[in-house]
Amino acid sequence: MSTKRDYYEVLGISKGAEAQEIKKAYRKLAMKYHPDRNPGDKEAEEKFKEINEAYEVLSDDTKRKTYDQFGHDGLNGQGGFGGQGGFGGQGFGGFEDMFGDIFGDMFGGSFGGGRARRRGPQRGADIRQSVTISFEEAAFGKKMSIKVNRSEECEECNGTGAKPGTSKKTCSTCNGTGQVRTVQRTPFGNIASSRPCSACNGTGEVIESPCSKCHGTGNTRKVKTIEVDIPAGIDDGQMIKLSGQGEVGEKGAPRGDLYIVVNVKSHPLFTRDGNDIYFEMPITFVQATLGDEIEVPTLDGKVKYSVPEGTQTGTVFRLKEKGIPRIRGNSRGDQYVKVVVEIPKKLNDKQKELLREFAKECGSNVHEKKKTFGQKIEDMFKKK
């Protein structure tokens, strides 16, 4: 019987684990026990070997099936650890594929060899800019011009960065590859890694005589006026994307994009919820009691609305298609009008008397408020 630990136990996974789960567990443990992170720790080194052995078997469907049926003994002669290639008979290439992104961080560049390539022209960066518009402009749209400070191709050197009459040279440090290779000793032998060449910034070319206008960058800053079409129905905080209006790209690479963030001012009368708007309409208690035809403000101007008699405060009525236009489609939201019945704070004697008569007609006894001493004195002087 084999004395090796169960491979599933080594990786801390169940026997029914999917391939992605196996890979995730392996990467986590390998990062933890890697010898470069545990220098001089023999136990960590052995653990690391055990983890790789387990993964080498469980990541291979054929070997995993054999292992599940016959255990460790069933793998004898199949090129497991100690077989050809050093690591599971796959050579170092498979190990590199698995750990390229991990060891790339450890060694400061690409892991392995033969994959380094010079950096290609980079797309321009995106620009983010804000505009502020009114509530009505958000509702019905607006065409506007904005000024954007962005990079433009240098007119002096046509974007090359080199002084007119000169050209870029092949980088002597990396011989035009854009990458510098290094070899480091590890417990597993020499490992080649590559990193972007610092002399040419990974481009493979250097400028010996920089352009005096752009100082070798190939671009200059300019303020550009751009026309923006604000669509009807846009809401506060939404963005408009203008493709190809961002920073200039390198060596003819595409420009970045311009993102316009729209800020919408609040309205003194209306509030917005989606494509609907809300408005509170004050009316007198007489209008509420007897009913009346009133004029209601809308985004399109005032419209007439008949308030039915007996309308209570808090009553909400709807004006169809008087809200915000929908960005996609030809329809609009609605306007909801909430009635607020205003009660007068001061009434003259005649108005009070009329209300008392009204109360009597309704069978409601309204007790007259007792006058204060000061009010009685005031009434005495009025009689004189």
UniProtKB/Swiss-Prot annotation:
GO terms for biological process: chaperone cofactor-dependent protein refolding; DNA replication; protein refolding; response to heat. GO terms for molecular function: ATP binding; heat shock protein binding; unfolded protein binding; zinc ion binding. It holds the Pfam family DnaJ_CXXCXGXG. Zn(2+) 1 binds at C154, C157, C211, C214. Keywords: Chaperone, Cytoplasm, DNA replication, Metal-binding, Repeat, Stress response, Zinc, Zinc-finger. The keyword Hydrolase does not apply. GO terms for cellular component: cytoplasm. CXXCXGXG motif repeats lie at residues 154-161, 171-178, 197-204, 211-218. Its main location: cytoplasm. Residues 6-71 form the J domain. Binds 2 Zn(2+) ions per monomer. Its cofactor is Zn(2+). Zn(2+) 2 binds at C171, C174, C197, C200. It is found in: Cytoplasm. A zinc finger (CR-type) spans 141-223. It comes from the Bacteria. Homodimer. Belongs to the DnaJ family. Participates actively in the response to hyperosmotic and heat shock by preventing the aggregation of stress-denatured proteins and by disaggregating proteins, also in an autonomous, DnaK-independent fashion. Unfolded proteins bind initially to DnaJ; upon interaction with the DnaJ-bound protein, DnaK hydrolyzes its bound ATP, resulting in the formation of a stable complex. GrpE releases ADP from DnaK; ATP binding to DnaK triggers the release of the substrate protein, thus completing the reaction cycle. The J domain is necessary and sufficient to stimulate DnaK ATPase activity. Zinc center 1 plays an important role in the autonomous, DnaK-independent chaperone activity of DnaJ. Zinc center 2 is essential for interaction with DnaK and for DnaJ activity. HAMAP family: DnaJ (MF_01152). This is Chaperone protein DnaJ. It comes from Clostridioides difficile (strain 630). The gene is dnaJ.
